Amino acid sequence: MATCPSIFDALVIGAGPAGLSAALALGRVMRTAAIFDTGVFRNAPANHMHTVPTWDHQSPVAYRQQCITELRQRYNGTIHFANTGVASVKAGKDSDYVVTDEAGKTWMGRKVILATGVKDVMPDVKGYAQAWGRYIFHCLFCHGFEQRGSESAGLLVLDKTILSTEIEIAVHFGHLALQFAKKITVFLDGHVEFLEDPRIKGLEAQGFLINPKPISKITYAADPEPGFATVHLEDGSEENMSFLVHRPRTLLAGDFANQLGLELTEAGDVKTTPPFYETSVKGVFAAGDCAVPLKQVVWAVSTGVSAGSGVNFQCLGADMAARSKLS
């Protein structure tokens, strides 16, 4: 491993597909980068990832490890790994940035790439978190194919803070779920006021089943596979579903957007400008789930490479300006 430079071209916060792809782009053009890896990933409950050519239905853990191995073997002269989280990030004195890791060590970089991902806000329903990623799916592009031919699927309307949005999602996911299951039930979790909502009545008219009863808990059969999830209702009744669909709200992982004063989108993601995904603060880029609404591995890879390219172009511009002053 080469000696760490006193100042890196980029400090990459996050070692998921976005951060690793950004590092790869930087390594290809001989830029130095430090990658901060907490080892915590949103898709940890999932055994497989999808829609990634040559890696479809394979382990996300194996994918990340292969990326890290490739970077270590081919680009160890410029790409450095720090197996620690980041405590803070701030602007330095000379148009650079300073990261303090969780061990108290400081790192300096010309640019920053946020690839921190997001955290899912789990609804306050007993058993939901345990079933998440196993029988409750937020994305049917990611998980639907493996459920094809199912007898039933349930759509959950749970988040009291965004109920109207949850109904819109249920309408969209309901029709999408029909591509994988024969019977669809919409669970309103006690929100009987939506029984008269034109969107719900429209689903009912099209053959969807509507269950307005409050949900007490969710359980699932771990064995044998394929099993089913059971929605337990407060009146004591139960409904078995081949799988459940719900997209919870997400929050940015870490306080770094706030520390840097970055603008956010209405959805709470970091606001960026294509094609290089620079944020509202010059020299700070964002990639992956924290920066795009479509939170999938392929998007993380794409935006990571774009952000890495953006860092190179800005560094190149500064290097050219410095050389011109010497001539």
Swiss-Prot record:
Pathway: Mycotoxin biosynthesis. Its cofactor is FAD. FAD binds at residues 15-18, 37-42, 50, 115, 289, 296-297. Coiled coil: none annotated. InterPro entries: FAD/NAD-bd_sf, FAD/NAD-binding_dom, Ferredoxin-NADP_redctase_2. Disulfide bonds join 139-142. One of its GO terms (molecular function) is oxidoreductase activity. Binds 1 FAD per subunit. Induction: Expression is co-regulated with the other genes from the sirodesmin cluster and corresponds with sirodesmin production. GO terms for biological process: cellular response to toxic substance. It is an enzyme of class 1 (oxidoreductase). Keywords: Disulfide bond, FAD, Flavoprotein, NADP, Oxidoreductase, Redox-active center, Virulence. It comes from the Eukaryota. Its EC number is 1.8.1.-. Homodimer. Thioredoxin reductase; part of the gene cluster that mediates the biosynthesis of sirodesmin PL, an epipolythiodioxopiperazine (ETP) characterized by a disulfide bridged cyclic dipeptide and that acts as a phytotoxin which is involved in the blackleg didease of canola. SirD catalyzes the O-prenylation of L-tyrosine (L-Tyr) in the presence of dimethylallyl diphosphate (DMAPP) to yield 4-O-dimethylallyl-L-Tyr, and therefore represents probably the first pathway-specific enzyme in the biosynthesis of sirodesmin PL. PANTHER family: THIOREDOXIN REDUCTASE 1-RELATED-RELATED. This is Thioredoxin reductase sirT. It comes from Leptosphaeria maculans. The lineage of its organism: Eukaryota, Fungi, Dikarya, Ascomycota, Pezizomycotina. The gene is sirT.
